[in-house]
């Protein structure tokens, strides 16, 4: 075990032009001497040796790679190489919010704590109010931004990033939240901003298609939802194998299925081009996860969870008159055939060619054009 406390893992893909901003934000940390930086290359042609000379006061390790695998597996290589007690990750085009960010996360560590959550800000385009960063206060967000994780806990519970290239951090975090059910383990929060999520580099998959898609990233209603569905299915199946009597899994499954309804209804209104794809995502989640527990969930419980989630989505639903009630949505899913990849391919074939071309650049769907989940037959 290293004498240092925290590893800062950085997945780096074609990041030579902007990684120095990220490293500079680590250089100024008040607890810099307790930190190890591990850069996991995700492009074999990249060379980051220059950063060791530019930041001589940082302990920096650079991990090579044979091929591009996506941010999840790059982060995992950081975790595998780390010898500290704690780890946090930061994208190469992001920065820590201020010099106290890592100290604030450290101060959140208590006995039996396996994760510390800070607040992150999202950089936004200039606007009349001159606001550049918007705090994101939703503690349950699925990303790894501004969070500190206990490595011993992760390794003991075999919680790792998968090969997913979209919402891979959602799968990772959902595994953690369901795994601590029934154990005296804590996820602590610190009410301080620790991380700035910047707008991203031009090759970021979360930015692809902005110009072609009326100013909104293509990712939001498309591959993000495909990835989130696969991530949730994988997390549920992983946790069920480890503890099939975990009630947290059932609750999470119901909540995710209800969320599929709101995603579909909003997509119909805001981006109908992807409505069929999002309905498929809901069908997939139903058949892979929800169907198995459906008989355990009463209509009253469903109504309560629906009401809670409607409140969460209230601002997103302004001006939208749902074409289906939740229970009509459920009946529609149950009444239609589900054909897995064959059905997904048919839906994708109806999308404009420019969407297919941009999605291919992201690599999310892989060579087979489909994201397989745990135990799914090919």
Name every feature range the model reports, one short phrase each:
Residues 223-230, 252, 277, 342:
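Alpha-helix boundary/N-cap detector
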Residues 55, 157, 248-252, 289, ...:
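Residue-level recognition of alpha-helix termini/interfacial anchor residues
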Residues 173, 250-258, 286, 302:
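Short runs of predominantly hydrophobic/aromatic residues within well-ordered alpha helices
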């Amino acid at each position: 075990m290293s004498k240092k406390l925290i590893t800062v893992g950085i997945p780096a893909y074609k990041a030579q032009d902007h990684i120095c901003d990220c490293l500079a934000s680590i250089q100024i940390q008040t607890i810099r001497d307790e930190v190890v930086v591990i850069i996991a290359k995700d492009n074999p042609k990249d060379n980051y040796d220059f950063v060791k000379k530019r930041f001589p006061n940082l302990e920096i390790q650079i991990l090579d790679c044979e091929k591009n695998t996506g941010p999840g597996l790059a982060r995992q290589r950081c975790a595998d190489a780390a010898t500290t007690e704690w780890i946090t990750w930061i994208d190469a085009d992001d920065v820590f919010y201020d010099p106290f960010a890592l100290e604030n996360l450290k101060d959140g560590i208590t006995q039996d704590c396996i994760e510390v959550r800070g607040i992150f800000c999202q950089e936004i385009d200039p606007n009349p109010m001159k606001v550049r960063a918007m705090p994101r206060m939703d503690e349950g967000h699925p990303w790894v931004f501004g969070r500190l994780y206990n490595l011993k806990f992760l390794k003991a519970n075999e919680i790792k990033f998968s090969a997913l290239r979209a919402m891979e951090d959602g799968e990772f975090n959902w595994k953690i939240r369901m795994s601590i059910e029934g154990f005296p383990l804590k996820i602590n929060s610190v009410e301080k901003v620790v991380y700035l999520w910047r707008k991203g580099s031009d090759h970021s998959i979360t930015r692809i298609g902005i110009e072609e898609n009326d100013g909104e990233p293509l990712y939001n209603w498309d591959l993000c939802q495909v990835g989130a569905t696969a991530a949730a299915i994988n997390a549920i199946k992983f946790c069920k194998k480890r503890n099939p009597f975990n009630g947290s899994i059932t609750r999470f499954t119901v909540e995710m299925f209800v969320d599929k309804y709101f995603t579909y209804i909003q997509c119909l209104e805001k981006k109908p081009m992807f409505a069929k794809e999002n309905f498929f995502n809901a069908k997939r989640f139903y058949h892979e996860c929800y169907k198995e527990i459906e008989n355990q969930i009463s209509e009253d419980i469903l109504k309560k969870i629906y009401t809670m989630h409607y409140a969460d989505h209230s601002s997103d639903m302004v001006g939208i008159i749902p074409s289906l009630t939740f229970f009509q949505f459920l009946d529609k899913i149950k009444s239609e055939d589900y054909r897995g990849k064959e059905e997904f391919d048919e839906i994708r074939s109806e999308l404009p060619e420019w969407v297919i071309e941009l999605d291919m650049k992201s690599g999310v769907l892989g060579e087979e054009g489909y994201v397989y989940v745990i135990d799914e037959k090919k």
